[in-house]
């Protein structure tokens, strides 16, 4: 079975790994500068590094249908810079999974494939997809909805270690992001962790950096 996954962030990559292990052929699409923050567990870095590995599965950047077909035959996961899915749809997937996690539908329709699945808020089962997967933390996480929609985006991050929105470090201004630390680093309160253009970004508490944008992302 041929499965196209829109998005190659951490949630999309978890889906891709599971389907790949089940023997399905998986292709993923991304934008030119991915917004993934949990980059060590995602296939999106293949867009700018050429290759990304998650749980022993190799994701490779592909720029043509021919490269994509070869990668699939080698049991790799092709990652395409194809935001509109024009190239990917030429592959004629049996299943389309929209796992962009944009909190809204960016153009997926129920006619895109025999089976269309929406992941997270912004989709309505039976209208723009066949089913929706709940992504909100809690008892319904991962539940498949055959009617209605996932819980709307609250704008508040899930609670981890007693912190919700407090665990997010935000830029103080616009500009191209440059990280000054790495995922896995222990940072202290007041430490410089990045720059948004000429605007410094400081940690407002001591923490473990477990998610971080790729350098060159434009902060606005």
Where are these predicted regions, by residue range?
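Well-ordered secondary-structure scaffolds
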Residues: 1-220
